[in-house]
């Protein structure tokens, strides 16, 4: 791995590690989002505060971390864009500022995808929205989309980055293992539910 790739990975990690969900809820006087609901710092848990605007802002900013990392690194050296995106994804999952305990990575995953293959990002968004509308489970929507993305990349857009998204999708599944257990048990919280 060259110096440039390492630099892109570190840059992406630092950008991805900004915990927007935590920062926004604290700034709004809602306390520590890690102490409510699932304890996650992502948009779905921020929504459990009852503040839809903050949840939307968290979703947008967490996605932008991934997109910005890809586009900025790619501007200077196109071959580093993928590594910056991976760094942003890992930074969101394992932020140094929070003892390496971050979010589940779905919004940042989408942001990286927007930067690398926006057409497939649209497929992700359509699948997520359809599953969320039909079943009201954010986790199920995310997991379904994460299965489809590497396949879509391979056949429709960018087979050279499909392997990256296979790895990222596996990590998304690992981070959602508790959600998967709750889905199977019928106890998973639905979108918009407080607590």
Swiss-Prot record:
GO terms for cellular component: plasma membrane. It catalyses: an acyl phosphate + sn-glycerol 3-phosphate = a 1-acyl-sn-glycero-3-phosphate + phosphate. The chain crosses the membrane at residues 4-24, 53-73, 80-100, 110-130, 133-153, 154-174. SMART domains: G3P_acyltransf. Its EC number is 2.3.1.275. It is a multi-pass membrane protein. It is found in: Cell inner membrane. Its main location: membrane. Pathway: Lipid metabolism; phospholipid metabolism. HAMAP family: PlsY. This is Glycerol-3-phosphate acyltransferase. It comes from Mesorhizobium japonicum (strain LMG 29417 / CECT 9101 / MAFF 303099). The gene is plsY.
């Amino acid at each position: 791995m060259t110096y440039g790739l390492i630099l892109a990975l570190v840059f992406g990690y630092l950008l991805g590690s900004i915990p927007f969900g935590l920062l926004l809820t604290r700034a709004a006087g809602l306390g520590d989002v890690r102490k409510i609901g699932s304890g996650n710092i992502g948009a779905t848990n921020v929504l459990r505060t009852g503040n839809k605007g903050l949840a939307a802002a968290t979703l947008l900013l967490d996605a932008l971390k991934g997109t910005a990392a890809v586009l900025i690194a790619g501007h200077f050296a196109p071959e580093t864009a993928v590594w910056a995106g991976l760094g942003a994804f890992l930074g969101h999952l394992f932020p140094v500022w929070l003892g390496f305990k971050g979010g589940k990575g779905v919004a940042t995953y989408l942001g990286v995808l927007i930067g690398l293959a926006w057409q497939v990002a649209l497929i992700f968004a359509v699948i997520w929205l359809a599953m969320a509308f039909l079943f009201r489970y954010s986790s199920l929507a995310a997991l379904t989309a994460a299965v489809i993305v590497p396949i879509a990349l391979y056949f429709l857009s960018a087979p050279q980055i499909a392997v990256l998204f296979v790895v990222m999708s596996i990590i998304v599944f690992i981070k959602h293992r508790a959600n998967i257990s709750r889905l199977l048990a019928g106890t998973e919280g639905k979108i918009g539910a407080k607590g």
